Amino acid sequence: VNARGGAGGKPIELVTLDDANDRKTAGANTQKLLTANNAVALFGYASATLSLDAMPQADKAGVLFFAPFSGANPVRQAPPVVFTVRASYADELEKMLAFWTGLGAKQVVVVHYDDEVGKQNLAVVVEYLKKQAKTPAAFSIARNAKLDASNFAQLMALKPDVIISTVLSGPAAEISKQIVARGSFVPTSSLSFVGAQQYIAAAGEAAAGVSITQVVPNPSSRAPIVTECAKAMQEAGMTQPMNSTHLEACIGAKVLTEAMRRAKKPGDARSLLAAMQNLGRYDTGGFVVNYAPGQNHGSKFVELAMVSRDGKLRN
């Protein structure tokens, strides 16, 4: 964008601060970005937890808070300055539950974190299955906790027909490896939150057969936005293959710069916020977002993909 003269004739400056995956640090960084750096938009916070202390600050300042990497309720039910480019976790969970219950699964076990977001994910499953007179079993774990053989035994004692995993790649991969090591087979689906490529790398051969929801096109597809983002990242010096997280970030960046281009006052936070609110339907190149006053969540796109034996994600 800057190579073409910027947005509205003004170059875009990207200021990046490391939050070390810590909520308090993310909140402190937000204050610095809003005060010392006079940010006109906050972009790409890595989770709902890291967004919790940042969103109220953005709301108070009237600054756009755009494209957090989360579909959790705290982000979906956030202040009016918060806009997303991805489907909600509820959308993802309903997609996988419709698939498995349609195949006759009765005992659904939800693996979730024992925090606010994890409990909300469990609640979505409870509400969905209530319509079918079913009740899921819950298996909660602490964030950053290591799973051992006793944890796995507790999980398997729940006798799952299917495991719905809402945790990150580390524990999700450990569960898959434990299942395979014991000669068992339990159908498993993970939220996009797992990080598909990170999970596949961590689980190795044990990832085969696991399904993962995707909220952006497959990074190996021929969608124009995939080609465009892969080229942009290569030109930026990235050597590893583009994954779903990279693609989601790139889509977010394209939508954000389009709103900047349409803003009536380039470089003005409130003008940018108004441009985003009135962006309407925007096709990024095979991935469509749609915003309007009162409609801050641009997409409900969800696909269910499966990991093949060669470690590829297949739709």
Predicted regions and their residues:
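Extracellular/periplasmic periplasmic-binding protein-like sensory domains
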Residues: 176-250, 307, 313-314
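Segments of small-molecule ligand-sensing domains
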Residues: 235-247, 257-313
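Extracellular/periplasmic Venus flytrap/periplasmic-binding protein
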Residues: 28, 72-74, 80-183, 219-227
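Loop/turn elements at helix/coil->beta-strand transitions in domains of secreted/extracellular proteins
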Residues: 9-12, 37-41, 60-64, 78-81, ...
